[in-house]
């Protein structure tokens, strides 16, 4: 029974980590587009998110050879 609870706890923690990373990657893409094109996705090529302590680094790239980094901070509750 204790092993089941431990495995369940680990699974829940991993699920939370994955969902936070997915949300952060989505935020990364939205920030790239908002800051450079004011919401226009026409020239958007890719956004990559690398998590760090209390936030992460977002790499933005557009088809017109514009590339830049954004530092995202996430509030800790």
Curated annotation (Swiss-Prot):
Residues 1-25 form the signal peptide. GO terms for cellular component: extracellular region. It is found in: Secreted. Keywords: Disulfide bond, Neurotoxin, Secreted, Signal, Toxin. Contains 2 disulfide bonds. The keyword Cytoplasm does not apply. Its main location: secreted. One of its GO terms (molecular function) is toxin activity. Belongs to the scolopendra neurotoxin 3 family. This is Putative neurotoxin 1. It comes from Scolopendra subspinipes.
């Amino acid at each position: 029974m204790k092993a089941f609870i431990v495995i369940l706890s680990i699974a829940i923690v991993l699920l939370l980590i994955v969902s936070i990373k997915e949300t952060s990657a989505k935020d990364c893409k939205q920030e790239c587009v908002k800051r450079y094109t004011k919401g226009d996705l026409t020239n958007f090529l890719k956004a990559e998110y690398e998590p760090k302590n209390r936030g992460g680094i977002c790499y933005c790239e557009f088809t017109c050879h514009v590339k830049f980094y954004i530092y995202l901070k996430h509030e800790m509750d």
